Amino acid sequence: MKKILFLMVALATAALANDGDVANQTLKAYSMIAAGLGLGLAALGGAIGMGHTAAATIAGTARNPGLGAKLMTTMFIALAMIEAQVIYALVIALIALYANPYLG
């Protein structure tokens, strides 16, 4: 009876020894999915924001051509801020892919 119990404990230990690797593989897969979705949504939102900013600048310049230079400067500042958000999403995605603190 003791031999059977020892054998069952040994087999259970061997069977459960690989769970850490499976958990790491799953976490890597979820990290890739999250990075792709997060960066895709950030790029989509940034593109929509840039489009609205450019459209508003063009409409403002068409209404008052004298303010074209000021509107253009303001538009470039706004575009830089919008693009910074997408770059932040890229940095977070790269951290999730290559320097994931949960993988150990």
Swiss-Prot record:
Belongs to the ATPase C chain family. Keywords: ATP synthesis, Cell inner membrane, Cell membrane, CF(0), Hydrogen ion transport, Ion transport, Lipid-binding, Membrane, Transmembrane, Transmembrane helix, Transport. The gene is atpE. GO terms for cellular component: plasma membrane; proton-transporting ATP synthase complex; proton-transporting two-sector ATPase complex, proton-transporting domain. GO terms for molecular function: lipid binding; proton-transporting ATP synthase activity, rotational mechanism. It is found in: Cell inner membrane. InterPro entries: ATP_synth_csu_bac/chlpt, ATP_synth_F0_csu, ATP_synth_F0_csu_DDCD_BS, ATP_synth_F0_csu_sf, ATPase_proteolipid_c-like_dom, F/V-ATP_Csub_sf. This is ATP synthase subunit c. The chain crosses the membrane at residues 31-51, 75-95. It comes from the Bacteria. F-type ATPases have 2 components, F(1) - the catalytic core - and F(0) - the membrane proton channel. F(1) has five subunits: alpha(3), beta(3), gamma(1), delta(1), epsilon(1). F(0) has three main subunits: a(1), b(2) and c(10-14). The alpha and beta chains form an alternating ring which encloses part of the gamma chain. F(1) is attached to F(0) by a central stalk formed by the gamma and epsilon chains, while a peripheral stalk is formed by the delta and b chains. NCBIfam families: ATP_synt_c (TIGR01260), PRK08482.1 (NF006295). It comes from Sulfurimonas denitrificans (strain ATCC 33889 / DSM 1251). It holds the Pfam family ATP-synt_C. F(1)F(0) ATP synthase produces ATP from ADP in the presence of a proton or sodium gradient. F-type ATPases consist of two structural domains, F(1) containing the extramembraneous catalytic core and F(0) containing the membrane proton channel, linked together by a central stalk and a peripheral stalk. During catalysis, ATP synthesis in the catalytic domain of F(1) is coupled via a rotary mechanism of the central stalk subunits to proton translocation. The record marks 83 as: Reversibly protonated during proton transport. It is a multi-pass membrane protein.
